[in-house]
């Protein structure tokens, strides 16, 4: 069996550790590099020690050298770091799975451009359930008649730094596009004070941050006399790690191009 060599950026973070644990359980994958920032206290340690099973892969901050021999880099870090890693991968011909959120429109264009040379799966949420949720939102947004107010509510742990979440924004994009709208023109991010009546055809976003919530997302379609709620709740980061590794396997057969989890799961 030919093993797929996986490098993990942000390897000592919550997602990084979960991804490495999941790689260790897979028969067809091998952890080829564990990467961190230059000031990380974990540098030069065995990455497997973080998950209880030493593996001989040393945590490194030199991406250019550490990525030698890797097929795919999985990156759940922050936008600035991801773009730096992207430049190295593009130059080295290494594919990427990007789960980082919080990119600006201009930063997303950089990712789109890099996909001319390498294959990239770029998705705000890697879980199977959330990507089925996106399809259900298309069905609801298309089937429900005019007059239903749309609100998106998301909740995450206290450490999440961007709001609304990338998944919530993608939910809004799916609904807006299905209804022939531009999300930038109809989105309402939070409400405070005397706001007046709710404007028709807008999409509201509400954000909750607290504790160790892995990720809850709800789309509320509120009509007169009834409301429809479509909800996904993640109870473990393992679901995101498993999805990211599915994405890495998907990229093994690609030369270049930009994909998302709808492509990986055959939903498009």
Curated annotation (Swiss-Prot):
Bilayer-spanning residue ranges: none
Top-tier EC class: oxidoreductase
GO BP, sorted A to Z: diaminopimelate biosynthetic process; lysine biosynthetic process via diaminopimelate
Main location: cytoplasm
Chain positions recorded as (S)-2,3,4,5-tetrahydrodipicolinate binding sites: 157, 166-167
Keyword Transport: no
Binding site for NAD(+): 10-15, 36, 99-101, 123-126
Compartments reported by the entry: Cytoplasm
Known pathway: Amino-acid biosynthesis; L-lysine biosynthesis via DAP pathway; (S)-tetrahydrodipicolinate from L-aspartate: step 4/4
Catalytic residues (UniProt): 156 (proton donor/acceptor), 160 (proton donor)
Keywords recorded for this protein, A-Z: Amino-acid biosynthesis, Cytoplasm, Diaminopimelate biosynthesis, Lysine biosynthesis, NAD, NADP, Oxidoreductase
PROSITE patterns assigned: DAPB
Catalysed transformations (reactions): (S)-2,3,4,5-tetrahydrodipicolinate + NAD(+) + H2O = (2S,4S)-4-hydroxy-2,3,4,5-tetrahydrodipicolinate + NADH + H(+); (S)-2,3,4,5-tetrahydrodipicolinate + NADP(+) + H2O = (2S,4S)-4-hydroxy-2,3,4,5-tetrahydrodipicolinate + NADPH + H(+)
GO molecular function, one term: 4-hydroxy-tetrahydrodipicolinate reductase
Coiled-coil positions: none
One Gene Ontology cellular component annotation held by this UniProt entry: cytosol
Pfam families assigned: DapB_C, DapB_N
Family in the record: Belongs to the DapB family.
Function description: Catalyzes the conversion of 4-hydroxy-tetrahydrodipicolinate (HTPA) to tetrahydrodipicolinate.
Protein name: 4-hydroxy-tetrahydrodipicolinate reductase
Gene: dapB
